[in-house]
Amino acid sequence: LTNATEADPVLLPEPGVLPRALPTPRSISTPTLFGFSLGMIGDRIFRDTPALLLMLFMTDYLAIPPALAGVAIFVPKILIIFIDPMVGVTSDRLNTPWGRRRPLMLIGGVLASLSILMFFHVPRFGLAVPQAIYMSAMVLVGFTGYSLYSVPYLTMASEMASSDVERRTIMSWRVVFMAVGLSISAFAGGLAQSIGGGVKGYATMSWIYAAICLSTMLSTVVATGRIATSPGDGERFSLLDQFRLVAANKRYLRLVLVSFAQKLGEGVGYTSFGYFCIYVVHQPLSAFGLVVLASTAGQVLAQPLWLKASRRWSGPTLYTVGALGWCLNLLLWLAMKDQSPWWLIPLGLEAGAAAGGFQMVTLGMLSNTMAADATETGMN
């Protein structure tokens, strides 16, 4: 990525003739963009609510040792690395009256939403190990459902657009709705405390969040019913062949590796933030809401600026700026011990502005890389 120039090779140039594998060019209407992006709320609720609260719930309410809780969450997420490509292969091969993306999105949305309930309705085995095994199994089931939804959802974004500008616009909308989903997730802990706290409070909260997750994800499935996605090219590849194709696509491989490191860093930050907020900065769990509300505002307000900047500078350059801004924000948190909680607002604003940048750029480059690969290989 660091070798990219102003004419970013990851961003697809405007082609004179569209490849046969992609849909006919079209202008994407605002209602379509809204309906498509709405699913990002449920997407982020599923990802961020467990990321922010699950470790705390397991250690503080289920009495699972932190190391065991960490392993219980980490191991199934490693397995998901292998499930994602299998979902992609399945989605590419589907040929149904409802398209090849939406059936998996429907199944995944339902499964992911039900898993939110399972995360916070844990059988009381009386021992830490059986409870950790249960949680690990639920994480595997839940994130399998998330893969079934998110993999075809992201692919659909590249198929909807016929130019780089449209793809960046789609991703900018998604980042805004992503910020809304993250904001809702941030209030989950405070909501659980306000409706009784403890295991019962978390269980009640999970019903509310599962309903929001399900309604927004399925709304996108319905809203995208008229979006034409290209049929599969008929070629079939084994999973090993799929990994070989990925390894041969250097642009995609670089982007995936960078994205993996980014998601790993974000995940560590989200998971540790609850402990950091309570035990280091000495703020209540409800402070999550204040921080992420400010972060959401930062993401939304900064999106037009990032979108404008993406027309002038390369994706890797903007990604670097956003990532450095995020890292600087994390360092500033170290100086927040026993400080006024009002400092959380400017920190949240800066974090949101930075994160909104590198998230939009990453999604945009991924979508463009997929479109470029379809152009070069004729396969979709």
Describe each region flagged by the PLM.
Residues 2-380:
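Membrane-embedded alpha-helical bundles of multi-pass transporters/translocases
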